[in-house]
């Protein structure tokens, strides 16, 4: 391949990158195992509580058992085994017992199961989370964002949204946007989004109570979470709900609790960099051959 061909190829790739490049504005908070586990506990408690409210309802039990399977799987059991063999056994066993008792219509047994599971999950927190992160306010705040991500995912499915509600770039920022109610196409996912939003609010309330020095930010975040629940209850359009989370909650949560966002690297930009490196390499290789 001669230099002219390489140059033409490079120009084409750079042009394509410029055409298709756009910054990703979605809040990407990265991963943190401790925050993920705090969120996981809140999510499991939410789903198991819904099972207790839908005893004998096979459709609801199927839905929430699938949700539980997402939040607690074989990998979670394996990781718990490394810390506590008893909890490694009891947590999945009690989840299964709750589902089984709910299918058989045994409300009393389900209530006992739920109480036991909540106890096991509470025990699991100091077992699974290292001491230096157990009372870390940033970790707890990050857990709130993880649960809110699930809220948006479930609500998007509930209203059959054609866009990803977790992508902030999909918000219509125009001044003429009017709030409106939308039809719910999946009642269970709608119910789930409400329950998870309540769980996120409770997580934040617990966090705020331990961080009274952040009262101004806490008040703003608390008000925004209350509005989110109101808008979900009113079946608000996706733009309203996304604004609640991305514009009203996230910025104050990030600044008040020092959450680090992780910028995403757009693929076209990466393609440009790779192309430049490739051209430099080819040019150097040709120069070496000419010297021989």
Residues of each region from the PLM?
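Short alpha-helical segments used as structural interaction elements across diverse proteins
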Residues: 1, 37, 42, 281-283
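Short, Lys/Arg-rich N-terminal segment immediately upstream of the first membrane anchor
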Residues: 1-2, 260-262
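Positively charged n-region of N-terminal signal peptides that target proteins for export
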Residues: 1-4, 287-292
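Sec-dependent signal peptide cleavage junction
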Residues: 18-32, 261-265, 286-288
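Alpha-helix boundary/interfacial micro-motifs
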Residues: 73, 280-283, 291-292
């Amino acid at each position: 391949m001669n230099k002219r061909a390489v140059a033409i190829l490079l120009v084409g790739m750079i042009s394509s990158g410029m055409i298709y490049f756009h910054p990703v504005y979605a809040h990407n908070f990265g991963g943190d195992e401790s925050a993920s586990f705090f969120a996981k506990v809140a999510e499991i408690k939410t789903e198991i509580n819904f099972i207790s409210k839908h005893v004998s309802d096979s459709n609801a039990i199927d839905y929430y058992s699938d949700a539980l399977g997402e939040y607690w799987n074989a990998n979670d059991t394996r990781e718990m085994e490394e810390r506590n063999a008893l909890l490694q056994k009891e947590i999945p066993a009690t989840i299964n017992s709750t589902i089984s008792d709910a299918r058989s219509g045994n409300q009393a047994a389900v209530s006992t199961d739920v109480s036991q599971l909540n106890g096991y999950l509470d025990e699991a927190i100091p077992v699974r989370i290292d001491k230096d992160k157990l009372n870390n306010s940033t970790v707890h705040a990050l857990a709130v964002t993880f649960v809110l991500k699930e809220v948006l995912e479930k609500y998007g499915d509930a209203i059959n949204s054609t866009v990803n509600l977790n992508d902030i770039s999909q918000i219509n920022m125009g001044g003429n946007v009017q709030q409106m109610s939308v039809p719910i196409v999946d009642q269970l996912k709608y119910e789930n989004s409400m329950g998870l939003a309540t769980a996120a609010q409770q997580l934040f309330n617990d966090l705020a109570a331990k961080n009274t020095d952040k009262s101004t930010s806490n008040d703003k975040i608390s008000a925004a979470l209350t509005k989110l629940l109101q808008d979900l209850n009113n079946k608000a359009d996706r733009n309203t709900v996304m604004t609640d989370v991305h514009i009203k909650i996230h910025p104050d949560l990030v600044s008040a609790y020092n959450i680090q966002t992780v910028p995403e690297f757009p693929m076209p930009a990466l393609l440009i960099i790779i192309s430049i490196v490739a051209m430099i390499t080819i040019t150097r290789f040709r120069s070496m051959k000419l010297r021989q």
